[in-house]
C-alpha cells in the first residue's frame, strides 16, 4: 500500500511512492530521457493507468503563467514505457478520467479552460475539445465529477467554486473573491 505523490519543487519534479511506513521511493523522475521539471498532479484511473501533469517546462514556473504560453504536458504510465501523450497545454493542472465516458479532462490554468480528450484503448489522447472557457479571475485548478454528470471546478485567484452541468451550463456555487486581488492578477496576466 501507499500513495503516489508529485514533487512540485522549485527546480525539479517527479512522482514518488510514499509507503505506509513513511519511506519515499522514486516512481518516475524522467520521461523521454529528460528529467521531469516540477510536477503538478498524478491520477490513477480505474484501469490502473497513471496520468501525470507537468504545468510548464520553465523554471521558475511563474514564467509559464501567461495567457498564450503553452508548454505543459501529460504523461501516461501503463504497461508500455512512460510517455508524453499530450503537449502544448496552457499550464497543465489537475487531470481525471471521467468515470462514465472514459474521457480525460484537464484544467489548463493559465489558458483559463477545462479541456477534454477522448482516450483510445492504447492510451492515446484524441479529439481535444474545450469543455468550458473561464472568465475574469477564473483560473481553474482542481476539479471533481458529480453523480449528475457535472464538473465542480475550483478557481485560484478568484476563490470560486464553479459547477459545469452535463449540458455545459456554468453556475457559480461559491464566490469568495477579493476584487482588488483579482484586478491585480488580471493586470499582471
Roles of regions detected by a PLM:
Residues 1-7, 32-50, 56-58, 68-74, ...:
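Beta-rich, blade/repeat-based domains predominating
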Residues 1-16, 25-31:
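Blade-loop segments of beta-propeller domains
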Residues 8-13, 59-71, 109-112, 156-157:
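Short, solvent-exposed loop/turn segments at conserved positions within beta-propeller repeat blades
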Residues 16-22, 69-79:
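Beta-propeller blade signature
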Residues 19, 63-64, 78, 118, ...:
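Structural recognition of the beta-propeller blade-terminating site
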Residues 24-32, 81-87, 127-133, 170-174:
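A short beta-strand motif characteristic of beta-propeller blades
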Residues 117-124:
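Short loop/turn segments immediately following beta-strands, especially the blade-tip
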Amino acid at each position: 500500500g501507499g500513495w503516489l505523490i508529485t514533487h512540485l519543487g522549485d527546480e525539479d519534479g517527479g512522482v514518488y511512492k510514499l509507503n505506509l511506513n513513511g519511506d519515499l521511493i522514486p516512481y518516475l523522475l524522467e520521461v523521454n530521457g529528460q528529467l521531469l521539471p516540477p510536477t503538478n498532479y498524478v491520477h490513477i484511473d480505474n484501469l490502473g493507468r497513471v496520468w501525470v501533469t507537468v504545468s510548464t517546462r520553465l523554471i521558475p514556473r511563474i514564467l509559464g503563467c501567461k495567457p498564450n504560453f503553452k508548454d505543459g504536458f501529460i504523461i501516461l504510465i501503463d504497461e508500455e514505457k512512460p510517455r508524453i501523450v499530450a503537449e502544448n497545454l496552457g499550464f497543465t493542472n489537475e487531470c481525471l478520467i471521467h468515470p462514465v465516458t472514459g474521457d480525460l479532462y484537464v484544467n489548463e490554468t493559465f489558458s483559463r479552460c477545462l479541456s477534454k480528450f477522448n482516450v483510445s484503448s492504447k492510451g492515446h489522447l484524441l479529439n481535444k475539445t474545450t469543455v468550458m472557457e473561464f472568465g475574469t479571475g477564473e483560473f481553474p485548478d482542481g476539479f471533481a465529477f458529480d453523480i449528475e454528470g457535472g464538473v465542480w471546478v475550483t478557481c485560484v485567484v478568484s476563490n470560486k467554486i464553479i459547477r459545469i452541468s452535463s449540458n455545459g451550463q456554468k453556475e457559480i456555487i461559491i464566490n469568495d473573491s477579493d476584487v482588488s486581488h483579482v484586478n491585480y492578477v488580471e493586470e499582471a496576466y
